[in-house]
Amino acid sequence: YRRIAPGYEVYSKMGLYERRLDNFDERALIENTQVPGMCVNCHTSCKTNPDNYVFHIRGDHGGTLFKTGQKTEILKAKNDSIKGSMVYPYWHPSGKYCTFSTNMTRQGFHMVKDERVEVFDLSSDIFVYDVEKHELIVDTLLSTKLYSENSPVFSADGRTLYYITSLQQDYPLYYKDQKYNLCRIAFDPATGRYGEKA
């Protein structure tokens, strides 16, 4: 779990922790004091296995950390294939793949009562990362200019990738017009290939 003080405008000390349920012993996976001035996102484990997890470190020198067994790998936050950070992960049931959305997010704060904060995407695409081969699996069906693809999830059998998509709006002006479609695309776990249509 991620422990952070209440509020969302600023943060000071935060970290990702594991806790034993039998005796409540706690250990830090990482604290942001180890990466000064940066934010650590919630981590996602593969089928609740504490030895296999991923999380993203936000900031100028951020990256995405994969831990599989005894091996740790840090991926650059951006490269020529993806334009934003690797934000929302979801593991394939096999543990061989992890899907992400790559988002350029912004926050908008309201000036009226009972309206707190809106988080919106300036852009968002989806891809799958092959954990064993250390390769990005990208497709133009999941990376479009006019739409934001987001929140990818594998089906229980690992043969379908579900996600949401929406037409880009003029943010923050038209944030209330944001509507999402639920989509899916076939995924072959044996080859790491997507289907031909979404």
Over which residues does each language-model region extend?
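Multi-bladed beta-propeller domains
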Residues: 21-38, 67-85, 128-148, 186-198
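Blade-terminus and WD-like Trp-Asp/Gly-His loop motifs, strongest in beta-propeller folds
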Residues: 35-38, 44-60, 83, 88-101, ...
